[in-house]
Amino acid sequence: YPPQPESPGGNASPEDWAKYHAAVRHYVNLITRQRY
């Protein structure tokens, strides 16, 4: 499996959070694609 994205932390900027959420969505898509 690819490494899970790390949370930016409490003092992260909104841009960092947006990048993190996009990375999480991509990560979940990779995992579910491999499973089926």
From Swiss-Prot:
Which GO MF terms are attached to this record?
neuropeptide hormone activity; neuropeptide Y receptor binding
Pfam families found in the cross-reference section: Hormone_3
Task: Give Gene Ontology CC terms.
Answer: extracellular space
Q: Does the keyword Secreted apply?
A: yes
Keyword line: Amidation, Hormone, Secreted
Q: Where in the cell is it found?
A: Secreted
Q: Does the keyword Secreted apply?
A: yes
Residues with the Tyrosine amide modification = 36
Entry similarity comment: Belongs to the NPY family.
PANTHER family according to UniProt:
NEUROPEPTIDE Y/PANCREATIC HORMONE/PEPTIDE YY, PEPTIDE YY-RELATED
Q: What is this protein called?
A: Peptide YY-like
Q: Which organism is it from?
A: Myoxocephalus scorpius (Shorthorn sculpin)
